[in-house]
Amino acid sequence: MTPTPFGLSYLPETPSQTAGPYVHIGLIPSQAGFEIFRNNFSGDIAGADVEGQRIVIEGRIFDGAGHVTKDVLVETWQANAAGRYNHPADRQDKLLDQRFRGWARTGTDFNTGIYTIRTIKPGSVAGRKGRKAMAPHVNFWLASRGINIGLATRMYFDDEEAANAQDPVLNIIEQSERRRTLIATKSERDGAVVYTFDIHLQGERETVFFDV
């Protein structure tokens, strides 16, 4: 390899940038009014043939001042109903439903600020290296203007209290009262099971985020 004629100290650092305000055009074109892909990304990943209980996950995302943010990109990644991810690295001896991709991408509504994911309820996931099984959960990743690095968090289910109490990730959160920021609330609406999961980016009610 030929050495550079000058040291790295002469290379200026690239300025950081946030994802917005045009994040939807590049990452969720259908939400910006551009139907340019055959299969546009969406938050509806529970096809008719997918095994599992149909659920709706919805919520709003608040900034540090308590205002609803309306331009956030939301991605989710989850196991199937048997607790297995559709990924080569997951080699559990559990049913792999190839019809369920487990990954969704959507955005908060420009008017209401509500994001919506239509999916199935995941099963418990085997723990790594002999650890206890992880309670059913959905992984979240957020990007928006004002956020330099995407934020990662998790959503757990309030009707899985026993499993949540044993979850190894929830239990590493030292301030036990903050674990509640990761618990979604169950309700029923028009015959559908709905879990409400609001996310707070900053402030006294800040959601727990993970360095992944």
Locate each region found by the language model.
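Beta-strand-dominated extracellular/periplasmic modules and repeats
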Residues: 1-212
